[in-house]
């Protein structure tokens, strides 16, 4: 016979933010009697789900992946862009063992330090501030030859916007007294991810041999010439930049080659061409024995030092519940199933012991504004059934409607989506009351509360940086101000009378008064 549980549920209303401005605010205009009542009768607050509070750059809107990682891990998990930027600020970057080892070996062998990456402020695959820090660090350690191989963007930045970056690096090298931009090529070639090896080979030959379609004495001159050929940044053909004596830079034995992209998908192919012993993507004229460094791990089977290995998240909420012999359920529709499982568990695919999962198929419609309620009724049927079974200590549920319908930009549909979720919450709260359970109602980030762009008047389909709600439907108590998503797991453990592990840097923000 199974022991009867008093479940604690976490209901995540995806894309449901709070916004003072009520214009085209679907959350405000929706008829939500259940949430209105709960807000009057139970402790509630607003918490942060964006920017630095979830490990993103300041002001950056939150997203579902980041939100669920922060909620499930009970700590602020710094995303790569922020994590590396923070290490530069803290001074840790300059003593990073992978960088130090490669640079020092090159210097000792009288070799060169080559730095390659997407020279862009885009922040999607790389950030030029990281590349700048790497150039400074190499020179500070005594490198006499520093060569920058610049991949140009034009996708995550305007199509012709590289000139400012190139000018800034020309100035940087002048200040440092050594180093130069050695080559330019569009990301179309260097960062292919579809096994179009003919493209990658052009970048490889450019970096290793200085072999290029075009030869120039200055990077800005090279860019201007590319624009003259009607090549936008992304498509700039291979261009080698010579030194004052007309010599091109080449990659030789004992040189260091440091790849400054942090996003893996478009970094893998060119990396394999430099480090895989059995590489067969294209015929390589030269294969210098170099000290290669990946900024982050691009793939588990690429054998090269990694400057910033992925952080293994231990003692996430799911793991703590497992270790304490508790049972848990994860439930959502297809659209957010990975979020309440894989992302909530800190990037681990396998369920924990005692963790059950229920997947409800999202409706097969072209866009969700055609069915704004999505599969919320069926999801709630299964959720209520699970609550009534009293077999779970903790239930994690995500309602995707606010986000998925918010992305369509259809205001009327977003209002209907919010109303559908409100009705479902009424059923869930009622079921919990019958078994003496309680719940936290929150969101991972905003979306549906802003359905129009105030500047352009066009539909606003993106996430927002607004605060998100938190309601505690349970015992008497109060919620501390200034909470964030990483506080939810410690709060849940505290409500259950469980010890919060030291790895969780969030805090319990609910104080019970009974």
UniProtKB/Swiss-Prot annotation:
Keyword Secreted: no
Keyword Cell inner membrane set for record: no
Reaction equations catalysed: (2R)-2-phosphoglycerate = (2R)-3-phosphoglycerate
Biological process terms in GO annotation: glucose catabolic process; glycolytic process
GO molecular function, one term: manganese ion binding
Catalytic residues (positions): 64 (phosphoserine intermediate)
Keyword vocabulary terms for this entry: Glycolysis, Isomerase, Manganese, Metal-binding
Cofactor list: Mn(2+)
InterPro entries, per database record: Alkaline_phosphatase_core_sf (IPR017850), BPG-indep_PGM_N (IPR011258), Metalloenzyme (IPR006124), PGAM_B_sf (IPR036646), Pgm_bpd_ind (IPR005995)
Binding site for substrate: 125, 155-156, 187, 193, 263-266, 336
Family: Belongs to the BPG-independent phosphoglycerate mutase family.
UniProt name for this protein: 2,3-bisphosphoglycerate-independent phosphoglycerate mutase
UniProt source species: Shewanella loihica (strain ATCC BAA-1088 / PV-4)
Gene: gpmI
């Amino acid at each position: 016979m199974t022991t009867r549980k008093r479940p604690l549920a976490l209901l995540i209303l995806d894309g449901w933010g709070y916004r003072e401005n009520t214009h085209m605010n679907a959350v405000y205009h929706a008829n939500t009697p259940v949430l209105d009542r709960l807000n009057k009768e139970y402790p509630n607050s607003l918490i942060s789900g964006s920017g630095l509070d979830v490990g993103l750059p300041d002001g950056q809107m939150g997203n579902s992946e980041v939100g669920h990682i922060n909620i499930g891990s009970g700590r602020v998990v710094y995303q790569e862009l922020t994590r590396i930027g923070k290490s530069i600020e803290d001074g840790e970057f300059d003593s990073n063992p992978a960088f130090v080892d490669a640079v020092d070996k090159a210097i000792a062998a009288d070799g060169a330090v080559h730095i390659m990456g997407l020279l862009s402020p885009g922040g999607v695959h790389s950030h030029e501030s990281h590349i700048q820090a790497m150039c400074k660090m190499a020179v500070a350690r005594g490198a006499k030859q520093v060569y920058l191989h610049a991949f140009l963007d034009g996708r995550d930045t305007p199509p012709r916007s590289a000139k400012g970056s190139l000018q800034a690096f020309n100035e940087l090298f002048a200040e440092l007294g050594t180093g130069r931009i050695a080559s330019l090529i569009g990301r179309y070639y260097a960062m292919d991810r579809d096994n179009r090896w003919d493209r990658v080979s052009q970048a490889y030959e450019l970096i290793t041999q200085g072999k290029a379609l075009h030869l120039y004495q200055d990077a800005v001159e090279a860019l201007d010439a590319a624009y003259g050929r009607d090549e936008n940044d992304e498509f700039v053909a291979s261009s080698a930049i010579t030194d004052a004596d007309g010599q091109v830079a080449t990659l030789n034995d004992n040189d260091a080659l440091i790849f400054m992209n942090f996003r893996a998908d478009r970094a893998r192919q060119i990396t394999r061409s430099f480090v895989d012993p059995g590489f067969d993507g294209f015929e390589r004229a030269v294969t210098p024995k170099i000290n290669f460094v990946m900024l982050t791990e691009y793939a588990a089977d690429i054998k090269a030092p990694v400057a910033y290995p992925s952080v293994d998240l231990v003692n996430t909420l799911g793991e703590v519940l497992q270790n304490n012999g508790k049972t848990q359920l994860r439930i959502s529709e297809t659209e957010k199933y990975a979020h309440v499982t894989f992302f909530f568990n800190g990037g681990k695919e396998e369920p924990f012991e005692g963790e059950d999962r229920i997947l409800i198929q999202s409706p097969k419609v072209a866009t969700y504004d055609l069915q704004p309620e999505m599969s919320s009724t069926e999801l709630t049927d299964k959720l209520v059934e699970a609550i009534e079974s009293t077999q779970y200590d903790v239930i994690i549920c995500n309602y995707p409607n606010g986000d998925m319908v918010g992305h369509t930009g259809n205001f009327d549909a977003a209002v209907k989506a919010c109303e559908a979720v409100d009705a479902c919450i009424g059923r869930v709260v009622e079921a919990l009351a019958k078994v003496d359970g309680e719940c936290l109602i929150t969101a991972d980030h905003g979306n549906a509360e802003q359905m129009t762009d105030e500047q352009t008047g066009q539909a606003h389909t993106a996430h927002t940086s607004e605060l998100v709600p938190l309601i505690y439907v349970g015992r008497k108590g109060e919620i501390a101000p200034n909470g964030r998503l990483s506080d939810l797991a410690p709060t849940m453990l505290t409500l259950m009378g469980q010890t919060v592990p030291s790895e969780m840097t969030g805090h319990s923000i609910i104080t019970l008064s009974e």
